[in-house]
């Protein structure tokens, strides 16, 4: 995998250095140009020459390819489409188990529907009741179904149960 990546990177690097290939397409040039390392270029006293190739190759884009125009048009259309279409009330772009309704809709639903007394949105072994309910229930229930050994006023040791 690493060898394949290195080879493809090397090929792209080589293509960038030949005129009339990737580098020219990327910089929107319709003519070959060479920088100061790789041969002659148009002399500096020509001031309307738009490309400075000395260090970083800053340039004024000549002709913007129509693919970019199409992209801009596509983005404009997309925003219009999203404004025109109304989404159903339970819909959000999030997917998965807990995002079938948006969080705001979930709170509205939970206000509208009455839940059973021991129910909370937490899941798992220790959240079948909320912690406060567990504490209140613990005061009234006997420990694990066995009767209490200690009288109600005294402190029970942990091992008696």
Curated annotation (Swiss-Prot):
Pfam name, any one: Bradykinin
Residue(s) carrying Valine amide: 160
UniProt subcellular location: Secreted
Any one GO biological process: positive regulation of smooth muscle contraction
InterPro entries assigned to the protein according to its UniProt record, in alphabetical order: Bradykinin
Chief location category: secreted
Keywords: Amidation, Amphibian defense peptide, Bradykinin receptor impairing toxin, Disulfide bond, G-protein coupled receptor impairing toxin, Repeat, Secreted, Signal, Toxin
Intrachain S-S bonds: 150-156
Signal peptide extent: 1-23
Tissue-by-tissue expression: Expressed by the skin glands.
GO CC terms in record: extracellular region
Family to which this protein belongs: Belongs to the bradykinin-related peptide family.
Entry protein name: Kininogen-2
Organism: Bombina orientalis (Oriental fire-bellied toad)
